[in-house]
């Protein structure tokens, strides 16, 4: 697993200059094995509007050879939008999505639970304030294992 993390870091360093050049934002990089096949998944977004297939294709073309030099075995490269239930990876993501419903997974239990459906209320330094059961709960960013925007069909 440590080796996978190192590869993700190297892929991130490869991708970042192209992301900046294309005026996009990197959401996440995954290097995973699924069903016997290896995948490099790069999730990007356009902060100035909708991400289109041309952006994904263009980035894929720019980085493909460099990523192939890094990984010795066969893999599939996927470049896409993070989707409706995008992950929140950086502290800035929480600021950007204040007021949104999310699924929150903590590293340690809080009230005998690690998983919550909550709303981002505020970001205060390295702490995020969530609205849980009509109460404000402050949690340090480094106590969050993972979080995703919560898409509920009935919101429409």
From Swiss-Prot:
Entry GO CC: cytosol
InterPro entries named among the record's database cross-references: Ribosome_maturation_RimP, RimP_C, RimP_C_sf, RimP_N, RimP_N_sf
Domain of life: Bacteria
Compartments it resides in: Cytoplasm
GO BP of this protein: ribosomal small subunit assembly; translation
Name recorded for this polypeptide: Ribosome maturation factor RimP
Pfam families: DUF150_C, RimP_N
Entry keyword Cytoplasm: yes
Keywords per UniProt: Cytoplasm, Ribosome biogenesis
Function per UniProt: Required for maturation of 30S ribosomal subunits.
Name of the gene: rimP
Family affiliation: Belongs to the RimP family.
